[in-house]
Curated annotation (Swiss-Prot):
UniProt cross-references to Gene3D superfamilies, sorted A to Z: Pseudouridine synthase I, catalytic domain, C-terminal subdomain, Pseudouridine synthase I, catalytic domain, N-terminal subdomain
Biological process annotations from GO: mRNA processing; mRNA pseudouridine synthesis; snRNA pseudouridine synthesis; tRNA pseudouridine synthesis
Organism lineage string: Eukaryota, Fungi, Dikarya, Ascomycota, Taphrinomycotina
Protein name: tRNA pseudouridine synthase 1
Keywords: Isomerase, Metal-binding, mRNA processing, Nucleus, Phosphoprotein, tRNA processing, Zinc
Amino acid sequence: MGRGGKRTWYNGDRREAKRNRPNSIYNGEGRPENLVVGEKKPKRKVACLVGYCGSGYHGMQLNPPSKTIEGDLFDAFVKAGAVSSYNADDPKKVALARAARTDKGVHAAGNVISLKLIMEDEKLIEKVNEHLPPSIRLWDVIRTINSFNPRTYCESRIYEYMVPTYAFVPPKPSSILGNCIMKNSPMPAEPINKENINQLSRSLFYEEGKEFWDDYDIAAKEILSLYEQDPEGFVNPYSKRGAAALANSENNKGSEAGVSAKTNPDMDSDSSAIVNEFLKPDSVEDESAGSKIDPSYRLERALKHIEVLKLKNYRISADRLSVIRETLNQYVGVHNFHNFTVGQAFHQKNSNRVIRSFTASDPFMIGDTEWISCKVHGQSFMLHQIRKMIALAILVVRTGCPVERIQDAFKKTKINIPKGPGFGLLLESPFFKGYNEHKAPENNRDPIDFTKYEQKITAFKHAHIYDKIFLEEARKQVFHCFLSFIDSYNEEDFSYLSDIGITEKTQEVSSKLPDVLSSDEEEDSAENKDDLEG
């Protein structure tokens, strides 16, 4: 038997193995049993404009058996008849590709995937959307040139990151980080020159921080006084049981139970609902009144309630907003972002990235919490880069650190930068300027553009992305937990935020420590991390 015969036997064996292997592209489920094998129909290369909420998904790209956005999309294409039964077992057969491979939990108002679809049905978009959950939408299907690949033709991307303004409140003076800053970063001499952004930022750290935490201390002392009077009988006035006691106290003048309304001015019904959702252990306390719960635990929860409510009532000043904007502006340009991802060395060429703009919106209210929207426009991003950029900006602003510390992070010294919470990040839109201006018109193809779907996309963002972000923050106080962890972490690890700056010792400390707040997302994919964004 010659080489040809050997090759025939080998290929046949491979085909048999391929037929028999289990199919797992349908987000961990088997291939739909109702697929009917029919005649082969012509396919066309297209760009699909999509939007999605990433909550509950293990990222954008197919990764069997994990649940992914592309898994749901491909399943919908098959069920709508846009992918034939011959190709339903393997997305590679239809050349599936994407513009941005968003990370676990990251959302997208606009993203682009390309593949070869059967385009016979005029109602294809409607049919595909019928097979998708409301949190994933197909905006349009656009014919492209045959060589189109959204990743290589995508010239830049805009990401949006939602931040509650209380994230910029200075750390508590008694915390490890707060003490480190006060010990190593003195208040600038009077008078403060507000045109000097670093003097302004440092003065805000001391003045605004003192005002905020002094106000907290007053409320906390009243709670401590109640606790000291009767530790065993102490009831958290911010729990459901405590609120009932407060109402009873107000109805029965002269009663000593509970606290006065003046002691608890922030306890409106909405705040109570949100806080009780966040601090669910207190509902256990209500069910076992008089019980086995340690009184010191009740005190701890009461003090936490006060802190949460004070943070929710924080409103950002114009001066602090100007510091935020100047801090974000430090990222603009071509810089080495080896400190803003994982497994990347300073000398590697692909550590350099282009940031075209980084802006912060005016503050806006959602419920009783104030937010700002930060938008970064860049050529491409590495794994966790945006979340680390946001986290460092927050730390620089809230500690009164010189804004140039951002520039220091682009240098060779390795420093430890934590990842900001992932749920607040969304891909706004990828851009295909070169393709739209040259390749598309030259080949009689429509441009790839999201602008004509702006109203639909805005409505989708509010219904399925923003609301999820705001609700998760209201329920879990994610940013508060994140910053509380940072504030209580090893002093040496974040001493670079003080006037000590980045030194050789900073690198020694960082090299000995794992990435702060690392999670299963950190190891999501060591390979192709250059393609994994957020």
